[in-house]
Amino acid sequence: MSDQQQQQPGQDGQPFFNIQRVYLKDLSLEQPNSPHIFLEQEQPTVEVQVDVAATQLAEGVFEVTVIGTVTTKVKEKVAFLVEAKQAGIFDIRNVPVEQMDPLLGIACPTIVYPYLRSNIADTIGRAGFQPIHLAEINFQALYEQRLASAMEEAQAAGGNGGIVMPDGSKATH
């Protein structure tokens, strides 16, 4: 056996990224018009909303949550409403500050989202409805859209504003 201490990942100064855990944080299903809604013959309308949130839990440890809401209506009556939060805990160390936000807003949600899709489809199917398989999401395009929108809002609010990165510098795009 060696007397050398074994270094923990990320302690050598090299960028380190690890998925600690992916888990279902919250799931709810509402069927306010069951069982009568099952007798309707009309095609339902489906509305899907997806959002992303990130929280720092400890130094180098982050939780990224992808929130999905699916509302299905038949003749303006809600057939079902599913709300789910799928989360992941990630170890992220020695990553340059300017890369953290895209990592948390693009890479992590891309890892978590397939689990959310599966859980929502499974829940809808188990509720007695045809499963709805959510489309793939380009989280980079979504991130860039939100960044542009936030910059527009900041400029409209103060004229000289902008997004401030974690290191205090202003975002350049």
Curated annotation (Swiss-Prot):
Q: Which GO terms describe its biological process?
A: protein folding; protein tetramerization; protein transport
Q: Which UniProt keywords apply?
A: Chaperone, Cytoplasm, Protein transport, Translocation, Transport
Task: List the GO cellular component terms.
Answer: cytoplasm
Q: What Gene Ontology molecular-function terms does this entry list?
A: unfolded protein binding
Entries under InterPro entries matching the protein: SecB, SecB-like_sf
Task: Give the UniProt subcellular location, in the record's own words.
Answer: Cytoplasm
Which Pfam families does UniProt cross-reference here?
A: SecB (PF02556)
Kindly state the subunit structure of this protein: Homotetramer, a dimer of dimers. One homotetramer interacts with 1 SecA dimer.
Give the similarity note.
Belongs to the SecB family.
User: What is the protein's known function?
Assistant: One of the proteins required for the normal export of preproteins out of the cell cytoplasm. It is a molecular chaperone that binds to a subset of precursor proteins, maintaining them in a translocation-competent state. It also specifically binds to its receptor SecA.
Name of this protein? Protein-export protein SecB
Where does this protein come from, organism-wise? Ralstonia nicotianae (strain ATCC BAA-1114 / GMI1000)
Q: Gene symbol? A: secB
